Amino acid sequence: MCIRDSIVADERFTWFFDTFNDQRSAYFMEVNPNALRTDGLITTGQGQSINLNWDGIWDAKAEITDIGWMTEVKIPFRTFNFDPESDTWGVNFMRVIRRKSETVLWTGYQRNQGIERPQDGGLLTGLNGMSQGLGLEVVPFGILTGSEQNLTNGKDTDSDIDGGLDINYSITPSLKASLTFNTDFAEAEVDQRIVNLTRFAVQFPEQRDFFLEGSNIYQFAPASGVNPYFSRRIGLNEGQPIPITYGARLLGNTGPYNLALLHVRTGELGEISPENFSVARVKRNIGSESTVGVVYTRRATEGSGNVEDFTLQDRHTFGTDLELGTSTFLGDKNLQFQAFFVFHNAQFEESTTDFWDRSSRGFRLNYPNDPWAAHVSYREFGNAYNPAVGFAPRNAFRRLQPSFEYSPQFPGSDIIQQIDWELRFEHLMDLDFELLTQEVRLTLFDITFMSGDVISFDVARNYERLEFPFDIRRDNSIILPVDEYRTWTASGEIRTASYRKVSMGAEIETGGFWSGTQTQYGFDVSLRPLPGLELNPEYIRTYVDLAEGNFSTDLFRFEANIDFTNSLFFTTNIQFDNLSNLLGTNNRLRWIITPGSDLYLVYNHNWLEDEQFDRFRTLNRSGAIKVSYTHRF
């Protein structure tokens, strides 16, 4: 995602193009009165979403007048995949008037509809003479980097001049092949830091452009958390980049099929061996709103041989998922059903795990409507389920999760727009049907006012059976013993409307936590004193009082965005937490020279708090200048 994708708090004009008119996916675009742009990919089904990390090549101008504002948009046909034999696209338009908390849609304005649903759009007809030219796109780039790292025996400095090449070719207007050589992601955003007091790994979102395109096809059983393919397994190791030697990709549609094929080779880095990654994803459209799909991944590590007397072998993962949906249930209601099954081979030849140990399966029935909504899901993960190119923070469980929600609107009120009440239940067992986790969470109220302000309050009862000792700070200072823990918590949140020049949010959660109590509060502010300037400080503090010991955590984040023009942006990101004692800053200047051709200036600096001398000392710093040029034939 680039800085231009941050206009959600502004008045804006929004539209989508469903270029295959299949009512399953679409290109999402919007522009505000300052000609700042947002674009992304809409994916329907359970867990439907708008992925704003996709960046297309297009341009927009805007002008504010005495009677309002107007915009002019230029979008090359080459930016889209489409069917040249069809003269009809799906389309919808929306205007967001923030000062009135008002949203106006061209069509799809009923309560169970919206701009994020291509099946609720209208039709754009009479499209003729559309062409992608030769369909060849060449994107060379050059990069100058420099870095400095402070070591115990001195400083290690490095500098380099390098380059790479991306080639895209449209085999058909709806099917595109891509090659990338010596790929670099210096301009990618840094991950948002969190303080993780849970037992499980956190799934950070993908930020790299090459892996973002086609993400709507790669999605597998969304909302079920199965993740047989997770692109951050490729070219990253614990957040640190591993060089990508080359990659090849095929994306698009052919008839009723959606295809996504990927192969990437990563290079050697320290003790990390070169690897080859392959991914294949195929989905077939069924009827007007349903799909069935398969996924396959392979991970092959070169020269690994034996690992602690075990023989590492190529790791293969296979999966299938089914999505059934209708928007005409009982006349005008939405109803969705999802099912999936995934399995993989053993990591080592000597493994004694069986097929069911290395598999996951589940289903989900969803009734996402307004004012009544409900869902129930069930899933099982084997005790050795861990796909090599996927993400599985937890295995060896059976989980049942139902929820019920009632969200009435109040059209006759001048104060309240909507109130939401929700009941969620989680019942998680081990594979022997012994209870591990049980949570009942009740939203007593979640009120959206006509002003756009929101206030909510939840209560929850939780049961946890800890099977193994838990090092909660990950430094061996506080170890939670094997036991059963029962707690109650309460949480509340207040958030003001984002269209204001000063908007803010505050939240607090307090109650039982393992063997003691926890109180967490957070506060964030969004300041927009001038057009094109946005400042976002955020602070989260957590007090933990346990029978085994006490501690507190502090997390500070600050982001500043400056839009000099609709083609020149600067962002700075500062983060600190007192568990790692790391202070880091990421600074990026992006100049869109012409749509598709960019100049990036990037500077990163990380400090470690030295408690002995009560100061921060530099751990490392780095800078990069990267320029890319897109030429279309």
Placement of each model-derived feature along the sequence:
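Low-complexity/repetitive intrinsically disordered segments
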Residues: 1-3, 601
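Structural preference for beta-rich elements and adjacent junctions enriched in aromatics
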Residues: 4-285, 289-294
